[in-house]
UniProtKB/Swiss-Prot annotation:
Binds 1 Mg(2+) ion per subunit. Expressed in rosettes, cauline leaves and developing flowers but not in young seedlings. Its cofactor is Mg(2+). Mg(2+) binds at N186, D272, F274, N275. S-adenosyl-L-homocysteine binds at Y18, C60, N65, D97, L98, S142, F143. This is Jasmonate O-methyltransferase. The record marks H157, L234, E353 as: Involved in substrate discrimination. Its main location: cytoplasm. Its EC number is 2.1.1.141. SUPFAM superfamilies: S-adenosyl-L-methionine-dependent methyltransferases (SSF53335). The lineage of its organism: Eukaryota, Viridiplantae, Streptophyta, Embryophyta, Tracheophyta. It is an enzyme of class 2 (transferase).
Amino acid sequence: MEVMRVLHMNKGNGETSYAKNSTAQSNIISLGRRVMDEALKKLMMSNSEISSIGIADLGCSSGPNSLLSISNIVDTIHNLCPDLDRPVPELRVSLNDLPSNDFNYICASLPEFYDRVNNNKEGLGFGRGGGESCFVSAVPGSFYGRLFPRRSLHFVHSSSSLHWLSQVPCREAEKEDRTITADLENMGKIYISKTSPKSAHKAYALQFQTDFWVFLRSRSEELVPGGRMVLSFLGRRSLDPTTEESCYQWELLAQALMSMAKEGIIEEEKIDAFNAPYYAASSEELKMVIEKEGSFSIDRLEISPIDWEGGSISEESYDLVIRSKPEALASGRRVSNTIRAVVEPMLEPTFGENVMDELFERYAKIVGEYFYVSSPRYAIVILSLVRAG
């Protein structure tokens, strides 16, 4: 699988588009807002003389969420400046995603964004006719590598992106007295599960650790000393990588695929060969890589649960949510649409565009049945880091 080519959300404004099915991701951005505001306040307080701030949103995607994080950042800086008795700095904003992302959608949304910024911020440096401004640019490329000039950024944000890997993991194998890489042996699955071999678990963990180290090292070159990052992404609370919150959405999708294979609609060998470029890391893994890379200190690390539809969950409401059968099936369809908007471009090259409707109809039913007997949750990592130096 060429991850750079297929890792993008469903484009456009259709019923299966990411633009129409990204409420969960929007809620994850909102979940991290408090930590982001806190980090921005600390950044502004420690850089009182700075007149131009470099900001990057990594993995911005497309659709209504693509400018949500940046809007929040601009609003927070605008609200902080009067309290800190300082002028609003010039904001250099970079929106990043892979080249396959629908940047046309983002560009078409920018005039409305600029109008809102200018209309809301006149008199504080954002108005028309001069003064400090907000400049937005697109930067296509993988964040698993350098994207920006050295020490050009002050604040980096990323939401719902770092659980995606740079490539499908490979396993190590012995051949003629030498170690080689080989495809994973993960029969009947599309992600690690309780029945996956330990070699698959190890390969996924190693790929994430390698990618996250590269991500940190790349950002360490681009951020100024004292610069900050706020990252939110799917993770897990358990050391076990096969718990429900870290892998069960993939387990149910594999069930839908296998049901189609048994009916001869798709080939089972294609399921065996497909592995999702995804990993839900534990806090222990994150701390280990951050310490090993050595350029950042952890200011805050939180893990918050949300349900599969994107709703936040308090500790008091963590018990099973009772749903009627129609409610459960409706939830299953909403979750299926959300997952489809994200993973369909990955699945199509292997299984074919013509089976996608049938696949996600089955997936919706399977997820709906699961909602009837369970209340599945994701674990959202919210990580605030400070560049050392």
